Amino acid sequence: MTEARELAVVVGATGAFGQAIVDRLAAAGLGVVAVARSADSLAALRERVPGLIACAADIASDASVETIAAALDRPVRMIVHGPGVGVAGGILTAPTATLVDAVNIKVGGLLRLVRAADGRLATGSRIVAIGGHYGFEPTAYAAAAGVANAALMNAVRQLSLAYGPRGVTAHLIAPGPADTERLRRVAADRAALRGIAVDEVLADMLADSSIGRFTTPGQVAWAVAILLAPEADAMTGSSLMLDSGRRRGLP
């Protein structure tokens, strides 16, 4: 790693998606600033990824803007906003405060990240948000993810309009249910609501996919990396659907 390399900033860097994204962007030759709440988790990630810049910050707090900005010492090629939100249950039972928290993390967090990096963005820089399938295809059992990811898409569209004149593009990546520990928590919550076994819920989730699969963190990282191509300018304001054939609606 050299100091001349452009940076990628990854929020949620120690999660399943985040670690795969960090690996992919580091392999692409970018210096990576990894943002997460846990300093211990960041230290473990730094041991695995040589040259990683660890930045302990809570993206749900406005204080993160100054903390992240202080970690940036050169041009930023890409920012990736991928924090997780809590499993709040279905729309009939989810605490309203949990929904507000989810929007604060997803939308408020994205805006904090953008503001932290703004002075380092240049023509060709990418703003990337990791949303989710439930923002487009709602379910009664994932209220926080559905509401927050729908709002996130709107925010990405607004950012694409605001940053377009500067040659900076904004993108949403929307994975379907992914093979992660968080999915197991979602399945357990849904199983409790329906009074069935967790394995039955997971089987139902697989059946929703036209290819009978969950999305993987590696596939999400691949989608992030392809946005580095100059041709991806044409995709600003759009969503990359990585739902393994789950979406039924048009367009």
Q: Where do the language-model regions lie?
A:
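Conserved glycine-rich cofactor-binding loop
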Residues: 14-15
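Short, small/polar-rich loop/turn modules that mediate ligand/substrate recognition or access, typified
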Residues: 164, 169, 235-237
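Catalytic loop of short-chain dehydrogenase/reductase
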Residues: 126-165, 176-178
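Rossmann-fold cofactor-recognition segment
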Residues: 48-63
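Catalytic Tyr-X3-Lys loop
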Residues: 85, 92-112, 128, 145, ...
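Short C-terminal tail/terminal secondary-structure segment
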Residues: 232, 236-251
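Amphipathic alpha-helical dimer-interface segment in Rossmann-like NAD(P)H-dependent oxidoreductases
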Residues: 70-74, 105-125, 160-161, 229
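Conserved NAD(P)H cofactor-binding loop of Rossmann-fold oxidoreductase domains
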Residues: 82-88, 245
